[in-house]
């Protein structure tokens, strides 16, 4: 992103005007304000480290950059079911790891970073209920405590999981993940570019997560059970008691999405 915006320039020559141009470049690429903050935070940290190593005393030009708010969260739309089915079909026609990532998200509702940061061993195909064990890893944290969960594999997610396990790489999506980091920003840019011509305006890769919630509502699943599958935080006190929903129960609900 940075080199695209300002070129491959000497670190000491980067000024606040370059940082502002970089921000404008990210906005033009369609990134939400939260994503822009995340990218700028990473670049700022890299600049701090590199300037110390090289003895550059200039103030960090990426500090204090204004980032306008947007309405991306409220305007983000679910992907219609007919579009989901067409995309899933095309994913297996192309049949590469990037398309498997889309397919696995489309029928699990995982956040992009959750899926991109998986180990292949997190995929449990030989269990009584095929599922993904979603846990924190050193290279990828989880958003909330409720994000840690077991997700049944059905439909296109199951088909993608078979292919990932057959490849046998340590990381499910090695293009975006290694032992030091999970590059969800890079994955987001690439996948949204491919999806742009295939989904309605206002939809992005994260929209599959919104769609899953709507699809589970359509088969009359209780709200707290939907939260358990998607890793959303459930409001109220009652959800803190008991052991939650059994994986086999969640699997039966998820199988309804194949109809």
Question: Which residue stretches match the model-derived regions?
Answer:
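N-terminal DNA-binding recognition helix of tyrosine site-specific recombinases/integrases
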Residues: 1, 9-20, 28-63, 111-113
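Basic, Lys/Arg- and aromatic-enriched nucleic-acid-binding interface segment
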Residues: 33, 37-39, 57, 61-118, ...
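Short, charged phosphate-coordinating catalytic segments
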Residues: 48-59, 105-129, 223-228
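Catalytic-site neighborhood detector that most strongly recognizes the C-terminal catalytic loop/helix
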Residues: 78, 158, 178-179, 230-259
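C-terminal catalytic core of tyrosine-transesterase DNA break-rejoin enzymes
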Residues: 103, 107, 207-233
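Conserved tyrosine-mediated DNA breakage-rejoining catalytic core shared by Y-recombinases
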Residues: 117-160, 236
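Short, polar N-cap/turn motifs at the start of nucleic acid-interacting alpha helices
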Residues: 123-129, 201-202, 221-242
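Active-site/catalytic core of tyrosine-dependent DNA strand-transfer enzymes
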Residues: 154-201
């Amino acid at each position: 992103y940075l080199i695209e915006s300002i070129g491959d320039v000497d670190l000491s020559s980067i000024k606040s005007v370059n940082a502002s141009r970089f921000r404008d470049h990210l906005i033009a690429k369609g990134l939400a304000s939260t994503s822009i903050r995340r990218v700028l935070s990473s670049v700022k940290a890299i600049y701090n480290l590199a300037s110390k190593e090289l003895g550059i005393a200039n103030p960090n030009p990426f500090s204090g950059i204004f980032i306008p708010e947007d309405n991306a969260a409220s305007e983000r739309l679910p992907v219609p079911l007919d579009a989901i089915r067409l995309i899933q079909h095309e994913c297996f026609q192309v049949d590469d790891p990037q398309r498997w990532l889309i397919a696995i998200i489309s029928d699990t509702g995982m956040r992009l970073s959750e899926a991109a940061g998986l180990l292949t061993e997190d995929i449990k195909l030989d269990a009584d209920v095929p599922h993904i064990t979603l846990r924190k890893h050193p290279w990828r944290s989880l958003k909330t405590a409720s994000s840690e969960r077991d997700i049944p594999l059905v439909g296109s997610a199951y088909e993608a999981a078979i292919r990932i396990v057959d490849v046998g790489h340590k990381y499910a999506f090695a293009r975006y993940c290694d032992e030091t980091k999970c590059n969800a920003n890079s994955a987001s840019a690439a996948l949204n570019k491919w999806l742009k011509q295939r989904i309605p305006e206002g939809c992005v890769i994260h929209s599959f997560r919104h769609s899953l919630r709507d699809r589970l509502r359509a088969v009359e699943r209780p709200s707290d059970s939907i939260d358990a599958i998607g890793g959303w935080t459930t409001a109220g006190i009652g959800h803190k008691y008991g052991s939650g929903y059994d994986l086999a129960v969640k699997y039966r609900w998820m199988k309804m999405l194949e109809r």
